[in-house]
């Protein structure tokens, strides 16, 4: 007997759900409510390597969606200023995905000039977008809004209703809430215990023009006085944003700092800055009754380490797996809590391990006991099941912060 699903919200999470559902749940009737008047979030998204499999699972070729979405290859993450605000004393660090590859040293690039200034995309992948025989040793920088449109174009069975709804439409077996931070139809808003206080809750974002002298093939995250700043290079622009704590700095002061940083770097803005705010939270039970929250509807803590789109991807794939296997919603909620915990712990490490004390934000972000608990958590579970971030990524993070002694066995 065919079942029906109603997706409310035509955002990235909404269309990703529709596209994946068409491919993997062929017996279901699919309807999406896509209100054209509601703007999409995002200024440029950094992704995890798992996204490659995601596109392949929907039958969308890399050489198709990357060209349409102005995406570029991402080879890791560049961190700067997380240990000290003094550029003379700071030692910037690059974490690379190919540390997780068995043949890492056979694939090492000559030097930094290979991945700085967009040269890898130009030398290897610029024309063909061809990656034969490659493993998950790269990810992507994408325009999330463009990926939603690309998936929408591939959908053939999804009924589209261009309307904004205020109540759940009648007659569907399952509802997917993709309404973002508004979370209009989430039935159980009990927050998951984060076990710590997360301060960053706001962001100024503004795309800037590309610049071959400044653009990178890695996601650049630079710690600032009251949070951190990201740079995500696309083919047609660069996404920039300042993620900060509104408890420690005013919105106006944060904007001034953000614009000043852009000016000092020689960046030329496209349009006016936009401000976003949120309450760092994750819902304990994203699937309650017959409504499932997907994407930022299910939770949002911090855009650090490319977790935003991954959590959307995980929420959709785990939901399909749960239904196909005949599991109960409790199983889905339990799995999603674990996935969120993994991501949050890794994000937390950046603040807990930082040695910065130049502002109250960095002082408040520290908690020595939590730092020890974090490493205990890592030791306990890293060998028990697969993490979002593999051991190699944790080791690179420990190298940057010089914190291996926290989890090394004491003789």
Where are the model-predicted features located?
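N-terminal Rossmann-like FAD-binding beta1-loop-alpha1 element of flavoenzymes
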Residues: 3-28
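Long, low-complexity C-terminal extensions of enzymes
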Residues: 321-411
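Local beta-strand N-terminus motif with an aromatic residue
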Residues: 2-3, 172
